[in-house]
Amino acid sequence: MSRFLNVLRSWLVMVSIIAMGNTLQSFRDHTFLYEKLYTGKPNLVNGLQARTFGIWTLLSSVIRCLCAIDIHNKTLYHITLWTFLLALGHFLSELFVFGTAAPTVGVLAPLMVASFSILGMLVGLRYLEAEPVSRQKKRN
């Protein structure tokens, strides 16, 4: 396995662990969301919205962790890439379309993580596509 894919796997595990922490925080205290993320319109944040956000974050976390474990599973790889695309779209729309988020560290951090992850996973696709060919050459 290429060194890049090993780094990507480590990155996915780290992002997954952080997301699990965010999940716990969303279930524990919904004020976390309007103090850190949705500072533009904090009155729209309630317990139900926080728990929904928590479940979405947990699902993304599990998918990313599974991809780190089985990075050669192309279907899982593409689904994982979509979790980052959806997160990026969500936070950009909350920031620029709906106005529920302000450009604070709480929003800029997930935007950066999603952007770097998308970039890394797109680069990783080239390594995934190249690997089976190099494995076949070694066998012959």
Swiss-Prot record:
Membrane topology summary: Multi-pass membrane protein
Cellular compartment(s): Endoplasmic reticulum membrane
InterPro entries xref list: Erg28
Single GO MF annotation: identical protein binding
A Pfam family it matches: Erg28
Transmembrane parts of this sequence: 4-24, 52-72, 79-99, 105-125
GO CC terms: endoplasmic reticulum membrane; transport vesicle
Keyword Lipid biosynthesis found: yes
Keywords: Endoplasmic reticulum, Lipid biosynthesis, Lipid metabolism, Membrane, Steroid biosynthesis, Steroid metabolism, Sterol biosynthesis, Sterol metabolism, Transmembrane, Transmembrane helix
GO biological process, one term: sterol biosynthetic process
Family the entry assigns: Belongs to the ERG28 family.
PANTHER family in UniProt: ERGOSTEROL BIOSYNTHETIC PROTEIN 28 HOMOLOG, ERGOSTEROL BIOSYNTHETIC PROTEIN 28-RELATED
UniProt protein name: Ergosterol biosynthetic protein 28 homolog
Organism: Mus musculus (Mouse)
Lineage: Eukaryota, Metazoa, Chordata, Craniata, Vertebrata
